[in-house]
């Protein structure tokens, strides 16, 4: 992703730290999800969510005096990084009333603008395994599915669901000065190596801090926090993108100044992470009628949809969607020498050749990225607006001086004048995103859990091996590749699977070569 503000225009006139105080109690909103087995049986898991430390009220450990006010630090409490960490603590969160975050069963909603004592914009949350530990997912060889409602997200907003290689305990075991840990949402990192984090590795980020020129609540410090990032879903009602970002070091590490690269540095490509990624945005790839608001689009964003992402052991990534009980594969793309709908090495090579850039391959491409997906990654869900590029990289023409004839420049139908945070916040304060029905398991396991109905309420299907009928003496038909669709109501493509795979029914509308 291009611009992921760690303080997505966050809580006004507050501060943050990495030890905990108790003036406000901390109770994580509960959120259930399902873990599925290869046989298709899914069991409910009891989890919760926690808001990132950067949103929290931070004050002196012995009083309610702010350590950070507006977009500047207290010179008394925070003269340097180490002293600030000793003097300041972060406090609990009133999730619904302050941050617009609510849960119900397996559903999480994040509101855009919430007005309480102060104004809050957006939020970033992590799924918890326990009260003090983030839930980790090993993506390689597995699939991840969820339902999402983006109907209320206009141009300029991003309801994101993604994974990062941050520490499961929030950094407590590595950095003794961080005593708040995952319980208070510490330890964030991503492929932009964000420098707007108030605390990194148990110390403040006050040294070298420069207040933002266009955001009264944020700034950039001397350090950043880097790690690999898998953007499963960056989207609003206009555009959506799927993007892996490798780093030469997989897990969380601190960086310094412009050596961080990414959004927050003058040298975007000067760090250890790939800030651009290998993105799959159907609109950018020329399919302008696949995703958008209204019945004229294949996927109608005025309605909830299911998103299923599969991580092959080869490192390739597959995607399909379900809406109103009908399954839709990722649309095919024709890009240079590449033709298909799988995000793989050939696709990423073709994208760089056609659209320009080499950051993804320079940082090791999918081979390096497999090192992240083969280990534990933390699930992040957020809603944010973009003070750096107005989200134009997701839903408009970007860079704005390019035209429709420039390969890859047009990413969505939004105007190049859209997405200005001040306008979006005033015009769409009630915007929200809802994520629900999270499932995780081996490839082919989450599409139709035992005893449940496929999306849209169709009768449950069974996971069985189906051999297509053959006619004696006829020539064999076309063969479907591994992970490709091989059957289902309304499907007319190849039904014979490649050698070593069989056609398995996931639901009445979708069978897949597995």
From Swiss-Prot:
The record lists the catalysed reaction(s) as: Hydrolysis of (1->4)-beta-D-glucosidic linkages in cellulose and cellotetraose, releasing cellobiose from the non-reducing ends of the chains
Composition-biased stretches (Polar residues): 401-437
Map out region (Catalytic) in residue numbers. 18-453
Enumerate composition-biased segments (Low complexity): 460-479
The EC code for this enzyme is 3.2.1.91
Per the record, the GO terms for biological process are:
cellulose catabolic process
What compartments host this protein? Answer: Secreted
- Which residue positions carry a glycan here? 62, 287, 401, 462-465, 470-472, 474-475, 479, 481, 492
* UniProt modified residues of type Pyrrolidone carboxylic acid: 18
Start and end residues of each stretch annotated as Linker? 454-478
**What does the UniProt keyword field contain?**
Carbohydrate metabolism, Cellulose degradation, Disulfide bond, Glycoprotein, Glycosidase, Hydrolase, Polysaccharide degradation, Pyrrolidone carboxylic acid, Secreted, Signal
Listed CDD domains: GH7_CBH_EG (cd07999)
- Name the Pfam families on file: CBM_1, Glyco_hydro_7
Task: For the region Disordered, give the residue spans.
Answer: 401-481
GO function terms (MF aspect): cellulose 1,4-beta-cellobiosidase activity; cellulose binding
Protein family according to the UniProt entry: Belongs to the glycosyl hydrolase 7 (cellulase C) family.
Q: What is this protein called?
A: Exoglucanase 1
């Amino acid at each position: 992703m291009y611009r992921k503000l760690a303080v997505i225009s966050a809580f006004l006139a507050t501060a943050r730290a990495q030890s905990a105080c108790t003036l406000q109690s901390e109770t994580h909103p509960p959120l259930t999800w399902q873990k599925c087995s290869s046989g298709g049986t899914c069991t409910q898991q009891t989890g919760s969510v926690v808001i990132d430390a950067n949103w929290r009220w931070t004050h002196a450990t012995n009083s309610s005096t702010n350590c950070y006010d507006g977009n500047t630090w207290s010179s008394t409490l925070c003269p340097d990084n180490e002293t600030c960490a000793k003097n300041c603590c972060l406090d609990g969160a009133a999730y619904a009333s302050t941050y617009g975050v609510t849960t119900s069963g397996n559903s999480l909603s994040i509101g855009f603008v919430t007005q309480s004592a102060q104004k809050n914009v957006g939020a970033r949350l992590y799924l918890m395994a326990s009260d003090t530990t983030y839930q980790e997912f090993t993506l390689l060889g597995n699939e991840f599915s969820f339902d999402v409602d983006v109907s209320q997200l206009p141009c300029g907003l991003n309801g994101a669901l993604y994974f990062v290689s941050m520490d499961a305990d929030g950094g407590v075991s590595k950095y003794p000065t961080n005593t708040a840990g995952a319980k208070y949402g510490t330890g964030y990192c991503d492929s932009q190596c964000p420098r707007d984090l108030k605390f990194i590795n148990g110390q403040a980020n006050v040294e070298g801090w420069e207040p933002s020129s266009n955001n009264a609540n944020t700034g950039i410090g001397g350090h950043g926090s880097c790690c690999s990032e898998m953007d499963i879903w960056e989207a609003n009602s206009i555009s959506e993108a799927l993007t892996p970002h490798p780093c030469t070091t997989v897990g969380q590490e601190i960086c310094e100044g412009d050596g961080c690269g990414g959004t927050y540095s003058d040298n975007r490509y000067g760090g250890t992470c790939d800030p651009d990624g290998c993105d799959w945005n159907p609109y950018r790839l020329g399919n302008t009628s696949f995703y958008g608001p209204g019945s004229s689009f294949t996927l109608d964003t005025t309605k909830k949809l299911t998103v299923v992402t599969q991580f092959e052991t080869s490192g390739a990534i597959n995607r399909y969607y379900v809406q109103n009980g009908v399954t839709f594969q990722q649309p095919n793309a024709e890009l240079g020498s590449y033709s298909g709908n799988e995000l793989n090495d050939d696709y990423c090579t073709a994208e760089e050749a056609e659209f320009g850039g080499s950051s993804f391959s320079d940082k090791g491409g999918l081979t390096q990225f497999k090192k992240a997906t083969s280990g534990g990654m933390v699930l992040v869900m957020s809603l944010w607006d973009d003070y750096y590029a107005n989200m134009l990289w997701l839903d408009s023409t970007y860079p704005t001086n390019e035209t429709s004839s420039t390969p890859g420049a047009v990413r969505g139908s939004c105007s190049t004048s859209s997405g200005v945070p001040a306008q979006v916040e005033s015009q769409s304060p009630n915007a929200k995103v809802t994520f629900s029905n999270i499932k995780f398991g081996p490839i082919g396991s989450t599409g139709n859990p035992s005893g449940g109905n496929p999306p849209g309420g169709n009768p449950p299907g069974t996971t069985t091996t189906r051999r297509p009928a053959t006619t004696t003496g006829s020539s064999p038909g076309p063969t479907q590749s591994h992970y490709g669709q091989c059957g289902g109501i309304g499907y007319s493509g190849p039904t014979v699977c490649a050698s070593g795979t069989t056609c398995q029914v996931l639901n009445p509308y979708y069978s897949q070569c597995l």
